A protein has these predicted regions:
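Negatively charged
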Residues: 2-194
Length: 194
């Protein structure tokens, strides 16, 4: 299903509620550039075999709601640019994501300029190697919750991970890289959820 609705920029509505996705392995760029979509119901998607979600919702500028609570991401390795340029999303619940196999989270939330909070408490980032531009231009983001599963040990590229995240506590435009991907009390931008 990679690129299935790629650059369907005139599309204002889309009924995909009857899609059988149980055998799908790739959803790269599936809705990329659907810039006029306001709502998109993917709540019934079976993603249990999907291994890559690169740019899946990238450029869905007007999307105001996205229910991903039933997404099974245990096989996914690539989440780069997954929500890139979802500028109208004010809320995004990804707390149920299994990220244990993910290696690439680069630009995952870039230009999600209305998001105020993200919950990574169930995120296992021990295999992630790329977090470049992950939160770039998330100007309203005030809180990023993490747990003890959060690890940057394998990351080799974290360039401008927090660039323009000016609402994060203690933000400094000179400090936007991996050195800030730690708890606030240790000099970073992240919050331990209690």
């Amino acid at each position: 299903m990679s690129g299935m609705f790629y650059n369907c920029f005139s599309l204002a509505a889309l009924n995909i509620s009857n899609f059988n996705t149980s055998s799908v392995t790739e959803m790269d760029c599936m809705f990329t550039g659907c810039s006029n979509l306001v709502q998109l119901d993917v709540s019934k998607f079976d993603t249990s075999k999907v291994v890559t979600m690169f740019c899946m919702f990238s450029g869905c500028y007007k999307l105001i709601q996205l229910n991903l609570s039933n997404f099974d991401t245990k096989r996914v390795t690539n989440m780069a640019s997954l929500f890139h340029n979802c500028q109208a999303l004010a809320k995004l619940d990804i707390s149920s994501f299994d990220t244990s196999q993910v290696t690439d989270m680069g630009a995952m939330f870039t230009y999600c300029s209305k998001l105020t909070q993200l919950d990574f408490t169930l995120f296992d980032t021990r295999n992630v190697t790329d977090t470049r531009w992950m939160f770039e231009h998330c100007e309203k983001l005030t809180t990023i919750f993490i747990s003890d599963k959060w690890s940057m040990d394998r990351v080799t590229n974290a360039m401008d991970m927090f660039k323009e995240c000016c609402s994060l506590p203690g933000f400094s435009p000179e400090k936007t890289g991996i050195e800030m991907a730690k708890l606030i009390e240790h000099g970073g931008y992240l919050t331990l959820k209690k």
